Amino acid sequence: MELGLTGKRVLVTAASKGLGRAVAEALLAEGCRVCISSSSSDRINAAAREMASGGGEVHAIAADIAVAEDCARLFDWAVRTLGGLDILVNNTGGPPAGNVLEVNEAQWNHAFESILMSAVRLSRAAIPVMRQGGGGAIVNLASLAGKQPIDGIALSNAFRPALIGMAKTLSREAAPEVRVNNIATEHILTDRIRDIAGRIWRRDDESVEETIERKSREVPLGRYGTAQELANAVVFLCSDAASYITGVTLAVDGGLDRGLF
């Protein structure tokens, strides 16, 4: 299947590790020209060096996407560096685990800015540029928490649905030139999941690995997914193979979501 991604100009946020990095690496492997960002200069530059060592064009910048000025600076830099933009992948690290009564107001405000407003700002900036270049694709990395609350992650439960709702609305406004879709992930084994397993889900008599094994039995496919499997879904939604798909939220969760839609 021809994906039509060679030479596409890409920006992936929160890409120094975890899901964001896996997505950036997968798009790089398809021949895309990739810009990546993270709040940590050391981490994002190290990631760029490692990714570039395998071949391909990758550029890095430090930016805090929870800050409006950094979003603007990041976007302007990416467009200057690549000469335009064809694909935007909105990803956010975190937010911290915790229940509604535990999370403080500063954390609520930061999650609002980083999860929702970063995607709003970058998408609003990207669509005119993509239209000028003949079209494009935006993919937001959301969570199954956007469809059904998950114990212990109140911030995701609150703001991932808002992200999905914004993107669904935007998909109609941006059409036909720009497609906008979401990925709803859950039970993808990352450092964040290990942290949540250890601090929120673990029973007193369990190790973290035993907790992960127990939680994996909740998944119809019987295991946690990998970051690469998530990245494959993002690549598909960015590609010509998904040219008639917009406004969808694709669950990459091993069948964990019980919903009909």
Predicted regions and their residues:
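Active-site helix of classical SDR
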Residues: S123, F159-R160, A167
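Conserved glycine-rich cofactor-binding loop
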Residues: R9, A14-G18
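Short C-terminal tail/terminal secondary-structure segment
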Residues: Q148, V235, T246-F261
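Active-site loop-to-helix junction immediately N-terminal to the catalytic Tyr of the SDR YXXXK motif
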Residues: V103, P149-N157, T169
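Substrate-binding pocket helix/loop in short-chain dehydrogenase/reductase
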Residues: C71, N99-V100, N104-F112, I138, ...
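Alpha-helical segment proximal to the catalytic Tyr-Lys
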Residues: P128, R172-P176, S243
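Residue(s) in the substrate-gating loop at a strand-loop-helix junction
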Residues: S143
